[in-house]
């Protein structure tokens, strides 16, 4: 059993810490880059996605000028233990709409309805929701009421309706994270540890991987419409 809590203000630090750990542990699953751990650049993307979610959690304070809500699932037996979370970005000028940039459930708590319950909680307030996911996750989101709308780079764009919202949704500047000093330091460390050739190979592998994902998504979406 589990409990759901909706947060519209900053969470206690222990909750944030568990959410960020879940994000880092599930990079391949929830990132649009979906790099495997075998790629040498994995640590860079781990840091970047963790920092991105950290910024969204900070934005619950209202100080970043974007609307953010958070649904947290905790173990009913141990309320301090986070087993899932869903980040929701309400849309300005459209009270029924939201975007869902991140959602994850602890590996040991999957297939117990946690993800579905968090999604139902959000859809009860924002029935017009949009998200992007991997091809493999499409059936799970279809079961929650989403439909395929198209391709967004390396992911399938899904919506609970056949059209997107006309309202504005505040998002963070992710590109700035990759230009940050911290990311440069991680890259320098990896370069010193593995050498330039290995890092160039890792970048080529990443680029091929992203091209393959984009082709896979495009083929899937074309097939769906066919």
Regions found by a protein language model. Name each.
Residues 1-33, 132-226:
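Terminal substrate-recognition subdomain of acyl/acetyltransferases
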Residues 11, 15, 45-52, 110, ...:
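Soluble or luminal CAZymes and related metallo-dependent hydrolases
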Residues 30-97, 102-103:
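A conserved beta-strand-loop-helix scaffold within acyl/acetyltransferase catalytic domains
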Residues 76-77, 108, 161-164:
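Short loop segments at secondary-structure junctions
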Residues 99, 130-133:
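A structural signal for short, well-ordered beta-strand segments and their strand-loop junctions
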Residues 103, 108, 134-136:
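Beta-hairpin (beta-strand-turn-beta-strand) motif
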Residues 105, 110-124:
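Conserved acetyl-CoA-binding loop-helix of GNAT-fold acetyltransferases
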Residues 125-129:
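Short active-site oxyanion
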